Amino acid sequence: MFSFVDLRLLLLLAATALLTHGQEEGQEEGQEEDIPPVTCVQNGLRYHDRDVWKPVPCQICVCDNGNVLCDDVICDELKDCPNAKVPTDECCPVCPEGQESPTDQETTGVEGPKGDTGPRGPRGPAGPPGRDGIPGQPGLPGPPGPPGPPGPPGLGGNFAPQLSYGYDEKSTGISVPGPMGPSGPRGLPGPPGAPGPQGFQGPPGEPGEPGASGPMGPRGPPGPPGKNGDDGEAGKPGRPGERGPPGPQGARGLPGTAGLPGMKGHRGFSGLDGAKGDAGPAGPKGEPGSPGENGAPGQMGPRGLPGERGRPGAPGPAGARGNDGATGAAGPPGPTGPAGPPGFPGAVGAKGEGGPQGPRGSEGPQGVRGEPGPPGPAGAAGPAGNPGADGQPGAKGANGAPGIAGAPGFPGARGPSGPQGPSGPPGPKGNSGEPGAPGSKGDTGAKGEPGPTGIQGPPGPAGEEGKRGARGEPGPAGLPGPPGERGGPGSRGFPGADGVAGPKGPAGERGAPGPAGPKGSPGEAGRPGEAGLPGAKGLTGSPGSPGPDGKTGPPGPAGQDGRPGPPGPPGARGQAGVMGFPGPKGAAGEPGKAGERGVPGPPGAVGPAGKDGEAGAQGPPGPAGPAGERGEQGPAGSPGFQGLPGPAGPPGEAGKPGEQGVPGDLGAPGPSGARGERGFPGERGVQGPPGPAGPRGANGAPGNDGAKGDAGAPGAPGSQGAPGLQGMPGERGAAGLPGPKGDRGDAGPKGADGAPGKDGVRGLTGPIGPPGPAGAPGDKGEAGPSGPAGPTGARGAPGDRGEPGPPGPAGFAGPPGADGQPGAKGEPGDAGAKGDAGPPGPAGPAGPPGPIGNVGAPGPKGARGSAGPPGATGFPGAAGRVGPPGPSGNAGPPGPPGPAGKEGSKGPRGETGPAGRPGEVGPPGPPGPAGEKGAPGADGPAGAPGTPGPQGIAGQRGVVGLPGQRGERGFPGLPGPSGEPGKQGPSGASGERGPPGPMGPPGLAGPPGESGREGAPGAEGSPGRDGSPGAKGDRGETGPAGPPGAPGAPGAPGPVGPAGKSGDRGETGPAGPAGPIGPVGARGPAGPQGPRGDKGETGEQGDRGIKGHRGFSGLQGPPGPPGSPGEQGPSGASGPAGPRGPPGSAGSPGKDGLNGLPGPIGPPGPRGRTGDAGPAGPPGPPGPPGPPGPPSGGYDLSFLPQPPQEKAHDGGRYYRADDANVVRDRDLEVDTTLKSLSQQIENIRSPEGSRKNPARTCRDLKMCHSDWKSGEYWIDPNQGCNLDAIKVFCNMETGETCVYPTQPSVAQKNWYISKNPKEKRHVWYGESMTGGFQFEYGGQGSDPADVAIQLTFLRLMSTEASQNITYHCKNSVAYMDQQTGNLKKALLLQGSNEIEIRAEGNSRFTYSVTYDGCTSHTGAWGKTVIEYKTTKTSRLPIIDVAPLDVGAPDQEFGFDVGPACFL
């Protein structure tokens, strides 16, 4: 249990760590100052800063910056333990082993006789965790970890409501631990601590009731001063000040957020023609056509009734051997066959069942002393011996698994610097210089006199920007900014708990009949009709040509048994039979096996030499021979290619000084070279003549800060900052009074799928679907399934005797026979070999404790322990050893130039030239490279006060506000009628809180509103601590069966039931196979000592038997008494939402329920629209004072209200939820959030196709719900908001998504009169005919813009599309002209990408016709069904049709436009 002392100690340590961290930062900033180490002295002992020690067992002290801070250890109260003991050097008492409270002791009668050992009970439930053991001695300090990253900013000093947990009357302040920093990397393991004293073994206690809060501890010492906190949040804006003069232009603002998506672009150019599409779905049933030619033979009809018996046919050829039939029933036993040849000796049979216990034999002679048996099981633990002398230190164990990260330790002292790392690799090679011009071979001349100074070059480019000057002193506070824009409404709250079901409303009046719905989708194919009567017998046809060999049919039903055949040849060797009874003693055996191989004999004499062998294969090449003598000089080779520049050689020796050369002519100025490394400073040159004044250089680096200027005039208020993030929800207010009864909730989310229902009654046969398009001729089909077995024919005549079949497979071993009678006692055998060690005997009684043994040798290295619990925060360790050298550094810069080389060999002497005169001054050189950055200039004088700056850009969004104070208990409002959700209005300004009104009478229940959209999931709350168990609720009604949850943890075993009656002995099943080795069970308590059995003889090791048959299931035992209820298992994952159930029958109205707990605060709502700009306000009074200075050592909590002192104050109140209601609320919030989240995730993973949860395409729906029927569903191909979802028809057989036109049929009438009826041309219906229109899609009431966007996405996600159009005609040719036999008068179709689709031409742009009834002018109405199928999905849907054969007064037409289907 986390005691108050722990908390105070934790706070003390956290404060120390904060202080230390601040000191380290301070040390780093001013490292030049040498600060002497701070120490503390107590009782004559000196302690370093941050040392922690216990001067007495019940006191703990820390050295804090020279001050000793001590605190008392407060112990937990031990209940029911009169003889508590305080261990040596410890402060808190513990209860010795075996001592129980008086209530547990009962009087006992005389001890009865010892019963037989009972069977081993089932494994008991895990006991509750025992109490914490006595703390061990502190371990040696570990090496210091590396410094952690800086902690998060501390809380400001004015957040009292959040910190009121550590209240103390006497304290003027208290420091609060910051959140835990991330753990540093793991340090080296410290040396093992000294072993703690042996703890007493506590009896496992019952789980106790939660104890009352302990008494309040004494006041802790004042914490060290905290690190300066970050600046507090800005105060509330003051009233606007007077308008200041406009300031200078502000810095450029951050880039704005991305703009809204732009307007829809212009229509793109037509794409290339796509490939021909696939056939669309079948159109509605056409009118009857004229009888067609005979169709291709149809599929095989259902099996007819059996015909008359035919004449016997000629015997067919022998068929291929059929598959083995199913094993027939066992025939009657045949006559005994002749004895087969003796079989091979079988393998050793499985070990037989033990025979019945034989009579005890006479005592045998004393056997040879057996090898020591395996160690028996550990006996019961003896009483603890006296502690032995300390053993040798054991070998270091392997590192344990890393424990849970402990609280971070205090930072250790800084270790000494590591040794110098190895030198870095040599820097990269410099670029080679350009080749010099070849000099004349003269001796080097003496150094000439310096030439005249050249003209000053133009000024170089501006140097780099100087370092940023030190930060100026803060200017005066600016005017307060205008009030921030109103924050958006918060996100939607979590769904409240379900309200109690309201009474059912009265039935409404019957509505008027609705308008006729749109034409239904084609029904599913009807079931096959009943078999027709058999037709009259046809004439015998001519024999057909032999067909191809069919596939082997499935095996027919087994025929009747034939007569028994003659005995077959001896079968293959069967499996070993069951072990027979022991036979009589056999005759003496044959001589034994040959002995083991003898020792090798002595080597024989050397034999004569053999013949020469054949020449061997070519050997591997030999090693290289010695180098030959040097050959003569060869002719000079042709010059090679220019080689790469070689690496720089070692510097040569310095050459001798040459003679003075002739000055050369002045060269033209070279191009500006690359900037060289900074050279060493040269000697000071002669003072040159002053150069002309250069242009003004760039500004130098800013000098040090000048004296503080006068305060500038206040700047204009900055633009409004973005509203801060929504603060954490304030602490929950107390529960309100119960509100009136709520409306009946909407139907809950779809439940998990129920168990499959019973088969329903067969539905009526559906209407026959429209004819599908003709498919391409299929490949030859595989043999169909075998037809049902015909009636059994008359028994055939017996066939000829077949050849003996192959021996069948060996049958399974039969069941083992009953136990045989015990055989006669055999003669004593020869003395057997020494037997294996027998099984371990039963554990002997516990002996008295032995004398203390000698110290044993160190044991072997132990197995790796399991990860221990996280340790308490360790004390700071001593400084670590110097670390190993660091890794090699990065390559260093190129080194300085090497020393002068050795003297070179002297070149041939050149002719001495005449002395030249000094050259003229050359033209000015090009500007030199930018100079190195200059040192900062001296401080400039204080500048004049600047003019105020312009309004700054809006500040960044403020940090999340701290949780508000706990709200007052609210009054329940009247439930209003739930209206439809209104459009989101701009949020009004928040009014001041009015006084609570009087409680109104409960309102009438409003009608249920539509269910709101699901809120976004809230942020994941931190897991609450375990709450105390709530009161038991009333029993709920049985819910629908959920899906089976994950298997719960095994419940605690019930008590042992009464012994059943002894059953008859079952037949012994054969031994099952050895199971896998189970995990080692927990060690059970030692059973009582059983009577000692006689030592059995060691049995021989049998071979492993074959796996036996599965035994029969035993009878079901009587039910045991109910076990105690197990702990509640974790909630199963939320199942997928089931389909919406049918409405239930009306229940009787329930009683008015109490109001449920208020739902958790919802996540923030979507941001509201920006309000209109208000009028500019008048300038306000001066702004609020600036942010507070850094806080002192603690937080001043003296202004908090005095807490009631009747009960001890719970110091961890705000850290721990010990209040059951708080826990319940928290759990409710978490559960609600989890349910909402899992529902949303389930909806994303498995959409329902509803308007609220649309699928992306029908193909997605089919994959998620393969058993759903075809019909209308909602899809949202572009995802995002579901308000633009469209309703489509999903063909669940194929996964096609079919989008219907908004107007599926065009009236049949005369649409067009041509001015010149003889001149025929294609006329577009939507573009050129009066009253015509281009076809739009998406069903009634959908927004065409939404549909266009959704179709674009649907096309992208589809690979093929198809559509049908039916053209109704009267005296108008649609496709084939019967008079001419050509397609000149065929219709044109226009696709979505404005491409024309024709009846003939390029096959990728042609449609097909499945039915053509408009081929001539008959004066009657006909129709032609056009189908277009393509993989270029951008061509569909069709938006216009152009007939050619129209324009006369007697020519009429109309269309039916089918859906465009995408797959």
UniProtKB/Swiss-Prot annotation:
Sequence positions bearing Pyrrolidone carboxylic acid: Q162
Tissue expression remark: Forms the fibrils of tendon, ligaments and bones. In bones the fibrils are mineralized with calcium hydroxyapatite.
Record's compositionally biased regions (Pro residues): 138-153, 332-344, 839-851, 995-1005, 1041-1056, 1176-1191
Post-translational modification (record): Contains mostly 4-hydroxyproline. Proline residues at the third position of the tripeptide repeating unit (G-X-Y) are hydroxylated in some or all of the chains. Contains 3-hydroxyproline at a few sites. This modification occurs on the first proline residue in the sequence motif Gly-Pro-Hyp, where Hyp is 4-hydroxyproline.
Glycosylation, residue list: K264, K1107
Source organism: Bos taurus (Bovine)
Modified residues (3-hydroxyproline): P884, P1163, P1178, P1181, P1184
KW Phosphoprotein (keyword) present: yes
UniProt entry keywords in alphabetical sequence: Calcium, Collagen, Disulfide bond, Extracellular matrix, Glycoprotein, Hydroxylation, Metal-binding, Phosphoprotein, Pyrrolidone carboxylic acid, Repeat, Secreted, Signal
Domain VWFC: 38-96
Chain intervals with Basic and acidic residues compositional bias: 228-242, 1092-1106, 1206-1217
Sequence positions bearing Allysine: K170, K1207
Region (Nonhelical region (N-terminal)): 162-177
Annotated compartments: Secreted, Extracellular space, Extracellular matrix
Propeptide residues according to the Swiss-Prot or TrEMBL record: 23-161, 1218-1463
Domain comment (free text): The C-terminal propeptide, also known as COLFI domain, have crucial roles in tissue growth and repair by controlling both the intracellular assembly of procollagen molecules and the extracellular assembly of collagen fibrils. It binds a calcium ion which is essential for its function.
GO cellular component: collagen type I trimer; collagen-containing extracellular matrix; cytoplasm; extracellular space
Region listing for Disordered, in residue ranges: 98-1217
Name of this protein: Collagen alpha-1(I) chain
UniProt keyword annotation of RNA-binding present: no
